[in-house]
From Swiss-Prot:
Listed Acidic residues bias regions: 918-951
Cytoplasmic side: 872-984
Protein name per UniProt: Calsyntenin-1
Membrane topology: Single-pass type I membrane protein
Stretches with biased composition (Basic and acidic residues): 886-896
SMART domains associated with the record: CA (SM00112)
Stretch forming the signal peptide: 1-18
High-level lineage: Eukaryota, Metazoa, Ecdysozoa, Nematoda, Chromadorea
UniProt keyword terms in alphabetical order: Calcium, Cell adhesion, Cell projection, Glycoprotein, Golgi apparatus, Membrane, Repeat, Secreted, Signal, Synapse, Transmembrane, Transmembrane helix
Glycosylation sites: 206, 305
Subcellular locations according to the entry: Golgi apparatus membrane; Perikaryon; Cell projection, Axon
Amino acid sequence: MRTAYFIFVGALLGVSYAKHHHAARAPIINLQGAEELVAVVREDENIISTVPDFAILSETGPVCNYLLTSQNNEPVPFDIQVVDKYTGAAVLRVKDAATLDCKKPEYNLQVQAVKCDNDNVKSEGVSLKIRVKDTNNHAPEIENPWYTFHVEEGKVVEEVGVLKASDKDCGHPNGEICEYEITNGLKELPFAINNHGVLRTTQPLNFTQSKSYILTVVAIDCAMRKSKSSLVTVHVDEKCVQGITAMNERVNYAPGVGSKLLLPDVSLEFCEKETICEPKSVQSVIELRAGHVTQGCARDTVYDNQTIQSCGLSTATVKLLNEEALTSSAENQILADQGIEFDGARGVTVSDENHQGLIPDHFTLSFSMKHAAGTKDEQSNKQNILCESDDFNMNRHHFSVYIRHCKLEVVLRREAGATSDFRAAEWRWSMPEVCDNEWHSYSLLFNGIDDVNVIVDGKSFKADERNPEILDDWPLHKTKATKTKLVVGACWHGRQQKLAQFFRGQLSSLYLLSGAVESERAIKCAHTCPEQLQFTGVDELLESQSATFSPDQTSLTLKAETSKQIGQMLKRVAYVNTQEKPAPGHRVFLVETEVTCKQDDKKMKLPSSKGYVFVQQAAEPTLSISASSQLKSNQHMVKVGQAMVPDLTITISQNNADGELEDVTQSHKIDYCKMHLQPARDMDVEYFSSPASLIAALNIEFEHDKDGILLRGEESAQGYKEVLSKVHYFNTRPESYAKRVYTVQCAMLKGRVLSNQLFVTMTIDGVTTTTSTTTEAPAPAQPDPIQFNFNSGETALDSLELIERHFEPAFDQLGSSRLQNILEMDLPRPKALLSHHGYDVGQGAIAGGAVAVVVVVCVGFLLVLLVIGVLKMRDTPMPRRRRQKRQSDGGMHWDDSGMNITVNPLDDVEKNGGAIDEFSDEEEEEETDGESECSYRDEEDDVSEDEEDQTEVLPHLDANQRVVGGLEWDDEDAISTNARSYRV
């Protein structure tokens, strides 16, 4: 018993000792073989993972806390939260109030595990290294939000200025600036910036183009994060450039725009210091260099109609060299500049139609020539421009103009009938223009052999004692053969019967006035260049300023006191070309400036400037016509006349100087318009109408042919539109066509400009017959008589108006041959006789003079009777009564489908009793006589098949029987008196 007690007490003491010993043991951090704890954290992270994880030896636990301390007693932005106190698992995190920054990239800390029940029991310290990783959470920053730099114009600057930027991030790539960028560089600004922020120019800057530039620049770190934009202003400092600046070297000129400024934005600078040259006066000379044809002044327009009228040139002048006639000839090459090239082996014989007989000693010869010097052998030979020599058996030169030794020489031999004197016969002019291989214009004025002058390019040649050389000779000897031959570009040798002494060069505009001499004033006027300079600032000139032109206005001299004044005057210099169609190409203009200094009147020349005027090809106007391409009609409308293009529109447009399309309809005229049927019309049944009164008021001729209509004559587009829109189409057998296709086309400028071809399709529908609602039609043999109400009142109508309103014309009641005869006369008719509502129908043929006289007499007589009848009807009130129909012995049978009545508008109305009586016997005799004069009895002898069928028009009448009684006329009278048939 005692033994058991001691065993129990010993066990209790052992357990108590074991517990005390365990509680007193310090925790041990398990590094799992590592020497220290390591962690990496991003600046923007809160939870940190360590290697290895936090843990303790399980037998040394439990732990409730970890203690973090720094070696330098710095604040620790971390704490550790225990997850499992027995294993020591914990989480390292950044304190809520703490912020990590890469500027402190590493933390060296000591970690100790603290016993749960006793804070004094701690583990040994373990090293914890935490490295902070940069996250590029800062954008780069440029030091200044605004930079200003200055650059001198005219040169490339490698360093305009330097921009500096920084980044609060650490190291590469987040903390380093790798690039600078100009963000508005899409505007092609002349600037660039490198990776170090150095701004430079890529091309010389121009103060005139832009006085300053504003750039937006950003800095970019190596991680491609951009900074905010910084504004950079670059001011361009103007550099004094001596001479003309801001000059547009190319000026485009469109024909017909009038004058155009050559130097609208120009300025003139003088950069010398006043100590060197103080300006006293400044002078600028503008020269327009316009040569022949390709370079500007077209000398071949010397003898055009406009020049002949304006300068008073003789209309008897003959053109000896016709370039247009030689276009298809293979003998000479037609050049692009409208000259003819002679290759030294060919010539052109002048026909007798252009010139006959010998050239007298009074004449004017004008021509344009381009001739090169050539070799010495070529210079020693005669090169004939124009030569008149014997046609057969002899080689005598009666007259010749030729080149030899680069001299222009003329031979004019007196004929055998002249006095036997030793007189002047040959002239030799020495002038540089002959062999400079440029186009020049020459005019030889022979007012007898003792009065000879030469005009070159519109300027008189200044003769002296030695130039020209004049050689004398005797007259030619008398011969039987007097026939001569005139040749251009060579000379005919009659003895050898071949051409010789050929010209080598180019000729153009060869004109001869035989037997008369043009005045020098007229020749100079004709050679005035149509291209000139103009000065538009005459009203702005000051007292010290002047503007002086050369005689031909191709040179202008401006004078002023300062360079700025000259610059303002240069802005007013303009170019003008008065030709309607100038030769396209470029013209050169030069500007020379000279400054006169106050110091000893020294003169200084400024740099010259050169520009070009590009004359564009004259744009032809565009002529367009439009209308509805589909036109619906019916047989009735075609029978009475269908307008063919009622909504026609004619428009003329042309590009203006700005290239914009402009309506110029009012400033042009139409030459002709044609309207053709496809296929061609049937001459027997198809006709056209023309508004005769309108055509008579316009300068238009109206013609018909098998294809259709032709309107011609220079007239406005509005005039043609009105006529064409009132042209009507007729068909006496409308059922023959279901549709008709026709085209309309117009032309202008002598036929050079054609309009579009307008296609119109006319669809002809059939006439719809209205059916009665009753099943039984009234008996055709006994219709109710037609009543005419002639009583006065609101509903009463004039008899003529009643006829026009209630009746329609029926062309089929007339034979086609008779109808064509009527239509061909195209004569005006009384209103009651018109069936086409004012349209004159015709084939275009005109009756003979005798027929016309008879027709005029008939129409006049009928008009008188018509007026008398109308006056009687209007003066006499008409009681209502039914017109009783009297049938002939054969009987009249009426057709219910339509009653044909031939109405004679000349019938008189009986005044007494209101009854419609016949005319008196006297009136009938007069009417019969009148009708016999204008009848077509002669034409009725040959009756066509269509005319033989006229009995179908009035089936109730016998063709050879006159109705007695109620009917006041018969079908025979209706045909012979031009009375219209109306269908009810």
